Amino acid sequence: MPRKGPVPRREILPDPVYNSRLAARFINRLMYDGKKGVAEKLFYKSLETLGEKTGEEPLKAFERAVESVKPHLEVKARRVGGATYQVPMDVRPDRQVSLAIRWLINYARSRGEKGMSAKLSAELIDAFNSRGGAVKKKEDTHRMAEANKAFAHYRW
């Protein structure tokens, strides 16, 4: 922990095509080994496909897909007197976006389609229609929080 106070958060510049910070964050998370050009190509190609399949503007469809994956509750482990409880907590807005992006990319990578852009567009289309692995993960997270509602008074 630094003595001079909290470290300021770095400002992420919006992406060049859609001028969106959300898209820039997604591209940065998608990137492997600093290969941003490759990540951008994948992202823009899958957004193009998403726009064609949904019949909506690609960025709006992408934002709706991310919105449908954002969790509002999560559980955090809390030790109380030798026992560990799963305590339901509200998720901060920036963490909601981070988790949604992470889940979308992870579930896209584990899909069976050929090529990452096809996998990513398929996962985004599923998220847009409120189904798929990332949406299931969100629902599981909410279910866990609901099941452990009895421990909500342990919040800190």
Curated annotation (Swiss-Prot):
It comes from Nitratidesulfovibrio vulgaris (strain DSM 19637 / Miyazaki F) (Desulfovibrio vulgaris). One of the primary rRNA binding proteins, it binds directly to 16S rRNA where it nucleates assembly of the head domain of the 30S subunit. Is located at the subunit interface close to the decoding center, probably blocks exit of the E-site tRNA. GO terms for cellular component: small ribosomal subunit. InterPro entries: Ribosomal_uS7, Ribosomal_uS7_bac/org-type, Ribosomal_uS7_CS, Ribosomal_uS7_dom, Ribosomal_uS7_dom_sf. GO terms for molecular function: rRNA binding; structural constituent of ribosome; tRNA binding. The lineage of its organism: Bacteria, Pseudomonadati, Thermodesulfobacteriota, Desulfovibrionia, Desulfovibrionales. This is Small ribosomal subunit protein uS7. It holds the Pfam family Ribosomal_S7. The keyword Endoplasmic reticulum does not apply. Keywords: Ribonucleoprotein, Ribosomal protein, RNA-binding, rRNA-binding, tRNA-binding. NCBIfam families: rpsG_bact (TIGR01029). GO terms for biological process: translation. Belongs to the universal ribosomal protein uS7 family. CDD domains: uS7_Bacteria (cd14869). Part of the 30S ribosomal subunit. Contacts proteins S9 and S11. It comes from the Bacteria.
